[in-house]
Protein backbone atom coordinates (compact mmCIF):
# COMPACT_ATOMS: atom_id res chain seq x y z
CA UNK A 1 0.00 0.00 0.00
CA UNK A 2 2.82 2.46 0.86
CA UNK A 3 4.60 1.57 -2.38
CA UNK A 4 1.41 2.24 -4.34
CA UNK A 5 1.03 5.65 -2.67
CA UNK A 6 4.61 6.51 -3.60
CA UNK A 7 4.12 5.49 -7.23
CA UNK A 8 0.92 7.52 -7.53
CA UNK A 9 2.52 10.58 -5.93
CA UNK A 10 5.42 10.43 -8.37
CA UNK A 11 2.98 10.07 -11.27
CA UNK A 12 1.02 13.10 -10.08
CA UNK A 13 4.15 15.25 -9.91
CA UNK A 14 5.66 14.00 -13.15
CA UNK A 15 4.83 15.01 -16.68
CA UNK A 16 5.31 18.25 -18.50
CA UNK A 17 7.12 21.03 -16.66
CA UNK A 18 5.02 23.59 -14.84
CA UNK A 19 3.87 26.59 -16.87
CA UNK A 20 1.81 29.70 -16.21
CA UNK A 21 -1.27 27.64 -17.09
CA UNK A 22 -0.60 24.97 -14.45
CA UNK A 23 -3.25 24.97 -11.72
CA UNK A 24 -3.03 22.95 -8.49
CA UNK A 25 -6.15 22.29 -6.38
CA UNK A 26 -6.74 20.52 -3.05
CA UNK A 27 -10.00 19.29 -1.55
CA UNK A 28 -10.91 17.72 1.81
CA UNK A 29 -14.22 16.47 3.21
CA UNK A 30 -15.63 14.93 6.33
CA UNK A 31 -19.17 13.87 7.13
CA UNK A 32 -21.82 11.17 7.51
CA UNK A 33 -22.42 8.08 5.36
CA UNK A 34 -25.29 5.60 5.08
CA UNK A 35 -24.91 2.25 3.34
CA UNK A 36 -27.46 -0.61 3.31
CA UNK A 37 -29.00 0.19 6.68
CA UNK A 38 -25.81 1.21 8.49
CA UNK A 39 -24.58 4.71 9.28
CA UNK A 40 -21.12 6.02 10.04
CA UNK A 41 -18.53 8.64 9.19
CA UNK A 42 -16.24 9.26 6.23
CA UNK A 43 -13.20 11.28 5.18
CA UNK A 44 -11.97 12.33 1.74
CA UNK A 45 -8.88 14.04 0.33
CA UNK A 46 -8.15 14.99 -3.27
CA UNK A 47 -5.34 16.82 -5.07
CA UNK A 48 -5.14 17.53 -8.79
CA UNK A 49 -2.95 19.28 -11.32
CA UNK A 50 -4.33 20.83 -14.52
CA UNK A 51 -2.79 22.38 -17.60
CA UNK A 52 -4.36 23.33 -20.92
CA UNK A 53 -3.94 19.78 -22.25
CA UNK A 54 -3.46 17.52 -19.20
CA UNK A 55 -5.15 16.47 -15.97
CA UNK A 56 -3.65 14.51 -13.04
CA UNK A 57 -5.90 13.59 -10.12
CA UNK A 58 -5.27 11.65 -6.87
CA UNK A 59 -8.11 10.76 -4.46
CA UNK A 60 -8.24 9.00 -1.10
CA UNK A 61 -11.57 8.08 0.50
CA UNK A 62 -12.47 6.01 3.55
CA UNK A 63 -15.42 5.38 5.85
CA UNK A 64 -16.35 3.39 8.93
CA UNK A 65 -19.77 1.76 9.43
CA UNK A 66 -19.92 0.01 12.78
CA UNK A 67 -17.26 -2.72 12.71
CA UNK A 68 -16.79 -2.41 8.94
CA UNK A 69 -14.47 -0.15 6.98
CA UNK A 70 -13.85 0.85 3.39
CA UNK A 71 -10.74 2.36 1.75
CA UNK A 72 -10.53 3.65 -1.81
CA UNK A 73 -7.45 5.15 -3.47
CA UNK A 74 -7.61 6.31 -7.10
CA UNK A 75 -5.26 8.02 -9.55
CA UNK A 76 -6.37 9.24 -12.98
CA UNK A 77 -4.33 10.79 -15.76
CA UNK A 78 -5.77 12.22 -18.97
CA UNK A 79 -4.16 14.14 -21.82
CA UNK A 80 -5.65 15.99 -24.77
CA UNK A 81 -3.90 15.44 -28.08
CA UNK A 82 -3.74 19.23 -28.55
CA UNK A 83 -5.32 22.32 -27.04
CA UNK A 84 -8.03 22.62 -29.69
CA UNK A 85 -8.82 18.90 -30.07
CA UNK A 86 -11.70 17.35 -28.10
CA UNK A 87 -10.22 13.83 -28.09
CA UNK A 88 -8.06 12.69 -25.15
CA UNK A 89 -6.59 9.50 -23.71
CA UNK A 90 -6.88 8.41 -20.08
CA UNK A 91 -5.43 5.92 -17.62
CA UNK A 92 -6.91 5.07 -14.21
CA UNK A 93 -5.47 2.93 -11.41
CA UNK A 94 -7.22 2.28 -8.09
CA UNK A 95 -7.06 0.22 -4.90
CA UNK A 96 -10.04 -0.83 -2.76
CA UNK A 97 -10.50 -2.64 0.53
CA UNK A 98 -14.01 -3.33 1.87
CA UNK A 99 -14.43 -5.50 4.97
CA UNK A 100 -18.21 -5.36 4.69
CA UNK A 101 -18.11 -7.09 1.30
CA UNK A 102 -15.32 -9.49 2.43
CA UNK A 103 -13.10 -7.78 -0.14
CA UNK A 104 -9.52 -8.07 1.11
CA UNK A 105 -8.25 -6.02 -1.81
CA UNK A 106 -9.06 -5.03 -5.37
CA UNK A 107 -6.64 -3.49 -7.82
CA UNK A 108 -8.41 -1.90 -10.76
CA UNK A 109 -6.89 -0.52 -13.95
CA UNK A 110 -8.52 0.98 -17.02
CA UNK A 111 -7.39 2.97 -20.03
CA UNK A 112 -8.90 4.22 -23.25
CA UNK A 113 -10.09 7.29 -25.08
CA UNK A 114 -12.43 10.12 -24.15
CA UNK A 115 -14.21 12.87 -26.02
CA UNK A 116 -15.61 16.25 -24.96
CA UNK A 117 -19.17 15.89 -26.24
CA UNK A 118 -20.15 19.38 -25.12
CA UNK A 119 -18.09 22.19 -23.59
CA UNK A 120 -19.84 25.36 -22.43
CA UNK A 121 -19.20 28.25 -20.03
CA UNK A 122 -20.63 26.54 -16.94
CA UNK A 123 -19.48 22.95 -17.50
CA UNK A 124 -18.89 20.08 -19.86
CA UNK A 125 -20.07 16.62 -20.90
CA UNK A 126 -17.54 13.90 -21.73
CA UNK A 127 -17.77 10.29 -22.92
CA UNK A 128 -15.17 7.54 -22.46
CA UNK A 129 -14.58 4.08 -23.94
CA UNK A 130 -11.81 1.66 -23.03
CA UNK A 131 -10.62 -1.59 -21.48
CA UNK A 132 -10.68 -2.33 -17.74
CA UNK A 133 -9.03 -4.97 -15.56
CA UNK A 134 -9.73 -6.13 -11.98
CA UNK A 135 -7.61 -8.26 -9.68
CA UNK A 136 -9.60 -9.02 -6.52
CA UNK A 137 -9.11 -11.14 -3.42
CA UNK A 138 -12.35 -12.24 -1.73
CA UNK A 139 -11.36 -14.20 1.40
CA UNK A 140 -8.28 -15.67 -0.33
CA UNK A 141 -10.23 -16.42 -3.53
CA UNK A 142 -8.32 -14.46 -6.16
CA UNK A 143 -10.30 -13.30 -9.17
CA UNK A 144 -8.87 -11.73 -12.32
CA UNK A 145 -11.44 -10.17 -14.59
CA UNK A 146 -11.37 -7.92 -17.67
CA UNK A 147 -14.11 -5.69 -19.04
CA UNK A 148 -15.12 -3.33 -21.79
CA UNK A 149 -15.75 0.03 -20.13
CA UNK A 150 -17.83 3.03 -21.14
CA UNK A 151 -18.94 6.15 -19.35
CA UNK A 152 -20.77 9.48 -19.57
CA UNK A 153 -19.79 12.34 -17.22
CA UNK A 154 -21.48 15.71 -16.73
CA UNK A 155 -20.11 18.57 -14.61
CA UNK A 156 -22.14 21.78 -14.25
CA UNK A 157 -21.80 24.96 -12.18
CA UNK A 158 -24.43 27.62 -11.60
CA UNK A 159 -23.47 30.34 -9.15
CA UNK A 160 -22.77 28.77 -5.76
CA UNK A 161 -24.24 25.41 -6.79
CA UNK A 162 -22.32 22.71 -8.66
CA UNK A 163 -23.48 19.25 -9.74
CA UNK A 164 -21.90 16.04 -11.00
CA UNK A 165 -23.65 13.16 -12.75
CA UNK A 166 -21.74 10.05 -13.82
CA UNK A 167 -22.72 6.70 -15.34
CA UNK A 168 -20.12 3.98 -15.99
CA UNK A 169 -20.73 0.62 -17.62
CA UNK A 170 -18.48 -2.46 -17.25
CA UNK A 171 -19.16 -5.47 -19.50
CA UNK A 172 -17.22 -8.58 -18.48
CA UNK A 173 -15.35 -10.11 -21.43
CA UNK A 174 -13.18 -12.72 -19.68
CA UNK A 175 -14.30 -16.16 -18.53
CA UNK A 176 -11.69 -16.58 -15.78
CA UNK A 177 -14.47 -16.45 -13.18
CA UNK A 178 -17.85 -18.14 -13.53
CA UNK A 179 -19.73 -15.24 -11.93
CA UNK A 180 -20.67 -12.44 -14.30
CA UNK A 181 -19.47 -9.21 -12.64
CA UNK A 182 -20.83 -6.91 -15.36
CA UNK A 183 -22.26 -3.79 -13.74
CA UNK A 184 -23.48 -0.24 -14.18
CA UNK A 185 -22.31 2.39 -11.70
CA UNK A 186 -24.29 5.56 -10.98
CA UNK A 187 -23.03 8.64 -9.15
CA UNK A 188 -24.73 11.96 -8.38
CA UNK A 189 -23.50 14.86 -6.28
CA UNK A 190 -24.59 18.40 -5.52
CA UNK A 191 -22.64 20.99 -3.56
CA UNK A 192 -23.37 24.48 -2.26
CA UNK A 193 -20.49 26.92 -1.79
CA UNK A 194 -20.74 28.58 1.65
CA UNK A 195 -17.70 30.82 1.09
CA UNK A 196 -14.35 30.77 -0.71
CA UNK A 197 -13.16 27.71 1.23
CA UNK A 198 -16.16 25.73 2.56
CA UNK A 199 -19.10 23.95 0.94
CA UNK A 200 -21.94 21.58 1.83
CA UNK A 201 -22.09 18.40 -0.26
CA UNK A 202 -24.67 15.64 -0.71
CA UNK A 203 -24.13 12.57 -2.84
CA UNK A 204 -25.49 9.20 -3.93
CA UNK A 205 -23.74 6.12 -5.36
CA UNK A 206 -25.17 2.85 -6.69
CA UNK A 207 -23.80 -0.26 -8.40
CA UNK A 208 -26.22 -2.38 -10.42
CA UNK A 209 -24.97 -5.91 -11.20
CA UNK A 210 -26.75 -7.07 -14.34
CA UNK A 211 -26.44 -10.82 -13.68
CA UNK A 212 -27.84 -11.14 -10.15
CA UNK A 213 -29.80 -7.85 -10.14
CA UNK A 214 -28.15 -6.71 -6.90
CA UNK A 215 -27.93 -2.94 -6.50
CA UNK A 216 -26.02 -1.81 -3.39
CA UNK A 217 -26.24 1.93 -2.79
CA UNK A 218 -24.91 4.53 -0.40
CA UNK A 219 -25.56 8.15 0.56
CA UNK A 220 -23.34 10.78 2.12
CA UNK A 221 -23.46 14.29 3.53
CA UNK A 222 -20.23 16.27 3.89
CA UNK A 223 -18.64 19.56 4.82
CA UNK A 224 -16.01 20.25 2.18
CA UNK A 225 -12.88 22.42 2.01
CA UNK A 226 -11.16 23.59 -1.16
CA UNK A 227 -7.96 25.50 -1.82
PLM regions and their residue ranges:
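Cleavable N-terminal export/targeting peptides
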Residues: 1-22
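Outer-membrane beta-barrel initiation region
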Residues: 16-66, 111, 199
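Transmembrane beta-barrel strands of outer-membrane/channel proteins
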Residues: 28-34, 58-64, 75-77, 91-95, ...
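Solvent-exposed loop/turn segments connecting transmembrane beta-strands
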Residues: 32-42, 63-71, 97-105, 137-144, ...
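Membrane-embedded beta-strands of outer-membrane beta-barrel proteins
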Residues: 43-47, 73-77, 111, 150-152, ...
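Repeated loop/turn-to-beta-strand initiation elements of outer-membrane beta-barrel proteins
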Residues: 51-58, 82-89, 121-125, 157-165, ...
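Detector for outer-membrane/organellar transmembrane beta-barrel domains
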Residues: 122-174
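Outer-membrane beta-barrel "beta-signal"
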Residues: 216-227
Amino acid sequence: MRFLLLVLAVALLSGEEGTDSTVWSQYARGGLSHDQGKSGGHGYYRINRKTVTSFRDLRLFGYGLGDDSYIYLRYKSSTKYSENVKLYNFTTASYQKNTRADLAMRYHFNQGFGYFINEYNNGHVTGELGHAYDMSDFLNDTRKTSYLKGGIFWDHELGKISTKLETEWFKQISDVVTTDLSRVQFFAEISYQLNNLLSLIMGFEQDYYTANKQSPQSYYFSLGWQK
